[in-house]
Amino acid sequence: MNIILSRDSQVRVMEDTVTNAEKSFGQFCSLLAAYTRKTARLRDKADQLVKQLIDFANTENPEMRATLRNFAEDLAKVQDYRQAEVERLETKVINPLKLYGVQIKQTRAEIKKFKSVRNNEIKQLEKLEKLRQKSPSDRQTISQAETSVQRASVDASRTSHQLEETVDTFQKQKLKDIQKIFSDFVTIEMVFHAKAVEVYSSAFQTLESYDLEKDLEDFRAKMHGVYGRYDARPPLMDTTLSPALPWSLAQSAQSTIRSQRKEAVSEDDSAEEDPVEDLRGQAQRLNQ
């Protein structure tokens, strides 16, 4: 009976190990899957922001247009990295956790098998004890019962040893998997953030180098140029500006000419619309 009690204690430890693993791995899988989905949603929102930035840039003056397009390009590049992050999380973190359910199920089946063998051993022992109490003189029946007990005990011992090896292997693999899964998780996050910081630094420099004064000059020239379009050109007008003409208006006229030239060049450069790239298309290159 002491052996049986020892086996019962051993089985409880094994069952607790598997139960705790099942609960914890299930929660890890659920939480990390939610983490990955939210990362994917963040990527989608950033894609929308990129599109909105490009749409807005197309309505602005040349300096702001170029700045916002470059900024949007950097932001889109970060989303390519984020897409790679999502795919790697699914492959190296979520899928291994999902597969753990199969291992837990197999280990539980081994424990159930052992408990069935152990119960048979207990049943044979109880049968032997009853025979000894009721028919102590029936040596043949008692001998047969003792043989059955011995056979059940050997079977239980063998199954117990097999189960011990199974659970030991399960525990060892569980610890290694926890280490690897979360090491992969941290590595994936570090790679993404390192690349993102690099691109965001470029985006910051792009915004910092924006020339506000050029756009203001262009904008003011446009405002003054609106009225100039409605003025009839006088015949044989002296090209020399009249001294009586206000200095600010003269400067405005010169600025208008410069801005019109800039606009012509800018319109040629932007004749072909830059489509928003499919951000998902670059993810495969990032995984290489």
Swiss-Prot record:
One of its GO terms (biological process) is cilium assembly. The keyword Glycoprotein does not apply. It holds the Pfam family FAM92. Keywords: Cell projection, Cilium biogenesis/degradation, Cytoplasm, Cytoskeleton. It is found in: Cytoplasm, Cytoskeleton, Microtubule organizing center, Centrosome, Centriole; Cytoplasm, Cytoskeleton, Cilium basal body. GO terms for cellular component: centriole; ciliary basal body; ciliary transition zone; cytoplasm. Residues 138-157 have a biased composition (Polar residues). It comes from the Eukaryota. Residues 133-157, 256-288 are annotated as: Disordered. Residues 6-217 are annotated as: BAR-like. Residues 266-276 have a biased composition (Acidic residues). Its main location: cytoplasm. Belongs to the CIBAR family. May play a role in ciliogenesis. In cooperation with CBY1 may facilitate ciliogenesis likely by the recruitment and fusion of endosomal vesicles at distal appendages during early stages of ciliogenesis. PANTHER family: CBY1-INTERACTING BAR DOMAIN-CONTAINING PROTEIN 2 (PTHR21223:SF3), CBY1-INTERACTING BAR DOMAIN-CONTAINING PROTEIN HOMOLOG (PTHR21223). Homodimer (via BAR-like domain). Heterodimer (via BAR-like domain) with FAM92A. Interacts with CBY1. The BAR-like domain displays limited similarity to other BAR domains. This is CBY1-interacting BAR domain-containing protein 2. The lineage of its organism: Eukaryota, Metazoa, Chordata, Craniata, Vertebrata.
